Amino acid sequence: MVGYALAIACATMGSPAAGSPAARADAPSCIEYDNAYKLEWQASWAVYQAGQQNPDDGRSSIVVDLPITIDAPLDKVWSVYSDLQNDLGRHPFLKGLVTHRTCDDGDFQVIDFTALEDIPMGPITYPGHTEAEQRINEAEHYYTSESWDLPNVTTHQLITFTDNGDGSTTVNEHITFVADAALIQFTADNGADSHRAYQNALKADIENGTL
């Protein structure tokens, strides 16, 4: 299972590991937001972090790479793609975003949030709450996203941006889905399909000038 270190989490859930970017940097500047989902995020993120301490917990994982080339310059694609708000109306499951905390330590901008989703599960739709943290490195044009939701599904994402030198940009989403063996294929297939749909919607709206 591929994991990416969490540089900044809620203070009640521990501090960054020694040697991590946040541990070396100055104290981050943070803004806290009060909302109805904040305690839920904190409790769920504690479960997520506990799971990270036990990577051999019996769950299965599937890794996918989802590259897409967008006919627009790197800076344009980066600014649109790394903005969570542009997911709304384009990610097929996503119905809302609730931000709990934003931090900036000079190297990374960190956003703690809950994604409100309607997830299709056969004949029914499951109202999921995905607890997540996005870490953005603007200087090096990449970001990571860590998320956890019921029933004990973890997703690790590394999104990178490559200037192709011809006015186009290739974005690759390297995603690791982790779930119980009975759910892993469904989780990976559903997750990959939703990300492809989101990528294609972003590509279209960047190239046609909507974004």
Task: List each model region and its residues.
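C-terminal region of N-terminal signal peptides and the immediate post-cleavage residues
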Residues: 8-27
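Hydrophobic ligand-binding cavity/cleft-lining segments
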Residues: 25-105
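Glycine-rich portal/gate segments that line the openings of hydrophobic small-molecule binding cavities
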Residues: 55-57, 99-151, 205-209
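Intrinsic-disorder/low-complexity, polar/charged segments enriched in Ser/Thr/Lys/Arg/Asp/Glu/Gln
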Residues: 61-69, 110, 129, 156, ...
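A short, structured loop/turn motif at beta-sheet edges
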Residues: 71-75, 102-107, 135-141, 160-170
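Hydrophobic pocket/interface hotspot
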Residues: 77-81, 87, 134, 144, ...
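Beta-strand/loop substructures that line and gate deep hydrophobic ligand-binding cavities in soluble
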Residues: 146-196
